């Protein structure tokens, strides 16, 4: 056993040391012939009929690449959602602009000591705001009718404190309320009775006294505004005049303002006089 491998070639030495059991499978004549390099490595040349599937273990690089791909998909989904939300926001904004109608505004400048002028409609004050570079605040009013959205802004002019600037926003959707005739004792020279008869707004006593002192004609503030408002309301002026006249007569008769003077009431019954009147 000590002389084993002495004088043997390198391929035989490697064969006997590394694979001692190969002699059982090969002939003795194999020692005489050179052995190939693949035989030295112990790799058999025959190929199996069925090759098993190769399952490679997951490496850190493959897992990281999958994570990166997942992040990219999430980012794309987030960008798509943001794009959709932006489109929806733009669409709603454009629809709001289209549905929002322009409200007409009309402004009047009137010389008056009274800030809130009587224009024939009923208003409710809902706010007050200071005006830049002006010591006079701005007052905000709203029409008291439930289905009417007309607003009014009243402020005194900074350049001319004796003038009042009234701005109307919108158009009334209802007729003006009927005006009540003044009581007995009021002088017709001030023009209040004639203004109420033709449908113009009655001004407060303070403003009437101020107008009489200044000897000015009645302002066109009420007439111009009312004419613009009544253009959008369809009604018959003659019928309205008759109704106002009959209601005014009933009010005067009920208050006892119309009295019979002289002896005519002793001869003719009172109901005949009322019918002829």
Curated annotation (Swiss-Prot):
- List every stretch annotated Disordered: 51-96, 183-206
Note one Pfam family from the annotation.
Answer: WRKY
Q: Which residues bind DNA?
A: 112-177
List where Basic residues composition bias occurs. Answer: 84-96
A GO MF label: DNA-binding transcription factor activity
Where does it localize?
A: Nucleus
Which regions are flagged for Polar residues bias? 58-67
Q: Identify the keywords attached in UniProt to this record, alphabetized.
A: DNA-binding, Nucleus, Transcription, Transcription regulation
InterPro entries assigned to the protein according to its UniProt record, in alphabetical order: TF_WRKY_IIc (IPR017396), WRKY_dom (IPR003657), WRKY_dom_sf (IPR036576), WRKY_plant (IPR044810)
Q: Which residues form a coiled coil?
A: none
Stored PROSITE patterns:
WRKY
Highest taxon, organism lineage? Eukaryota
Its GO CC terms are: nucleus
| Role this protein plays | Transcription factor. Interacts specifically with the W box (5'-(T)TGAC[CT]-3'), a frequently occurring elicitor-responsive cis-acting element.
Family of the protein in this entry: Belongs to the WRKY group II-c family.
Q: What is this protein called?
A: WRKY transcription factor 68
Report the source organism: Arabidopsis thaliana (Mouse-ear cress)
* GN (gene name): WRKY68
